[in-house]
Amino acid sequence: LRSNPTVDCTAAVAQDQSCTVSIKIHAQVSPSDSPRKDEVIIRGVAIQSLQNLAWDVNFYTRNTFSRANMDADSFLDYVAFTAANGKQDSPTAGTGDQYKYQARGLDIRYRDMSATEEITTTSQVHFSIVNRSTTVKSEGADGAIVVILAVEPIE
């Protein structure tokens, strides 16, 4: 599953601020109509970013979540990346080369409770991307970021 860098998280993001993203599960994971089309296991998280920043990817089970109200917060799990985790393809990388981050071997059982409660076929993985660096994530194309999720369907 892959976020869209021209649509998702395009604004500037200051330290400890976040942007939210939802990626559709159904039809990307399994072409069949599985009875559990709203449920996957997240096995890996990768980030492509034009800026070398520290990132957290926080997963939520609903499309509504609140930092102010713990009863309404549907937080499930998170994956943290430091700036040192960011690797470039070229040892002599220059402007415009991407930083790539990766976490494998995860076992995050994810169920879209919004889809379950709303009885919809549009299941999504809901997450936020949090900038943990003192440097502001740039807006627009200069701050492009993509989150890629490796998921396994639960049949």
Regions found by a protein language model. Name each.
Residues 47, 59, 81, 101, ...:
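Hydrophobic side chains in beta-strands
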Residues 2, 17, 21, 29, ...:
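Intrinsically disordered, low-complexity segments enriched in Ser/Pro/Gly/Ala and basic residues
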Residues 19-63, 146-152:
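Beta-rich globular "head" domains
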Residues 1-15, 34, 117-155:
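C-terminal interaction-tip segments
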Residues 73-117:
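Extended, solvent-exposed segments with strong compositional bias
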Residues 50-85:
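Surface-exposed turn/loop modules enriched in turn-prone residues
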Residues 14, 54-55, 65-69, 110, ...:
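Short, surface-exposed beta-strand/loop "edge" segments at domain boundaries and coil↔beta transitions
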